[in-house]
């Protein structure tokens, strides 16, 4: 492959396309195109390689329905220095609309990526060398990687397929479908070198874990429980997971508690137990930014200190809606988005923690058919140097990946 280099402003602008309906305060361009549909998925995965040149993506032939077991998607990477050329990499049948197949670069590597797949009656993960094409298959799927790329934590994608459609994989039935809180399912630790896998936290264990004061003791009698949204801390010493439940006393909506734990599942800490915690990101090894609905302020973004009760609101007057948040390198700027407003507009913006100012970046129209399981959230992901952001958007008639230039704002 050619030697990587910095993406110049001239090269960026040369690829700009006419976008509608949308508005932008900074340069935006499509880096994928039809007739196939392209997206990446979640906001907390490494989409850019360490040089910022190669951007991972997924390609699919259809939209507006649930994936079927036989549906396969194509994985590839986009060369930002070669007219956004699509480079095919692999295929998989373990995927969903919100998080794809967990495709991401292995931390620190400029040649190895990892993704989930289905082989026979089990889900697996595959480490692929994008230069040589060599593959190594691990006996379990992955959810979140450690920062050194040596291990991962994962949960049961079979269970997610029916408890939270859009986040699990279709193709293998959940053996515990009728079990409200199984003992043999939960969170597994996966050694990415040896493939060794062990259950470290069971769903049953957490369903038996009460919420200490000041958190209320919510009633989940008769409910079905599951885990979702795992993320390892920047120093690899802790990880977050969400405990969710619905049904029974909880009714038809789901409730959520946020926990942290050590990589072996020990030293559990309840971060938020008020039932309405949502998207989150580690700011550093000790602090977590998350949307939560908690007294007395209600729905806001809050900064939690891990393994303590300290919490404070962040941007309460300007970050007023839930979104997919992350910190740009240096932690001054929070990158965030919104769900569609009443005009179906999704807003991409920065929040300056130094001044408390919200800086609009771009607005993308979300057609009404993009809703529920197959909605197309922006899910902003930043480049290693924090100067570029990618988003998924369907404003041009089908989901594609767009590159946003932050340099006019952050320099």
Can you name each region flagged by the protein language model?
Residues 32-37, 90-96, 198-221, 361-372:
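Surface-exposed loop and turn segments in beta-propeller and other repeat-based domains
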Residues 58-71, 157-183, 242-254, 337-343:
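Short, conserved, GDST-rich strand-edge loop motifs in beta-rich repeat architectures
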Residues 100-102, 116-186, 201-215:
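Asp-box/WD-like beta-propeller blade repeats and closely related beta-sheet repeat scaffolds
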